[in-house]
Amino acid sequence: MKVYTHFIKIDENDGYRWRTLLQFGNSWDCIGSVVMKNPGSSKMVDSEPISNDVIIKNLKKYQDIELPWYEFSEDTTMKCIAELFAYKCGLTSPDALSGVIQIFNIFYIKEADLERAKSKDAKYGLPNIFRIRTSYERLRH
């Protein structure tokens, strides 16, 4: 399993992670999605954004805005998601999966503990890229 995500660093320990994709095999077809509470303990594999043109081309299918993608490590929850999908697909192992599972989170703060995630969310808020003005707000300005 490969883990790809957008990431914005807040400080040495904290950051925002969203649009997390779990890729299995060589396929980039979406095989499912899950909604989770907050990004967990997965860690950045490389501090440099992904630069492989083939990977970037495929990742762009899954993005709303043009931002860098990073590779992260898999965490325990991601492994459980893979096992659940393999089971529901009638496969004997997550290694037999082929495609992409999208993870959507309620919080974007990378923090495995929900209470700490809530606290950090209150402290940091959201970066401007997550702020979408409504039609009403646009008309007022």
Q: What is each model feature region?
A:
Residues M1-W69:
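Active-site and ligand/interface coordination hotspots across diverse enzymes
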Residues F24-D29, D95-A96, E137-H141:
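Flexible, charged surface loops at secondary-structure boundaries
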Residues V34, N38, N105, H141:
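Glycine-rich anion-binding loop/nest that anchors nucleotide
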Residues L59-L97:
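Acidic, metal/cofactor-coordinating or nucleic-acid-engaging core segments within structured domains
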Residues S73, T77-L84, Q102, N128-R138:
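Amphipathic alpha-helical interface surfaces
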Residues C89, D95-A117:
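Short connector loops at secondary-structure junctions
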Residues E111-H141:
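Glycine/proline-rich loop-helix segments at beta-alpha junctions forming the active-site rim
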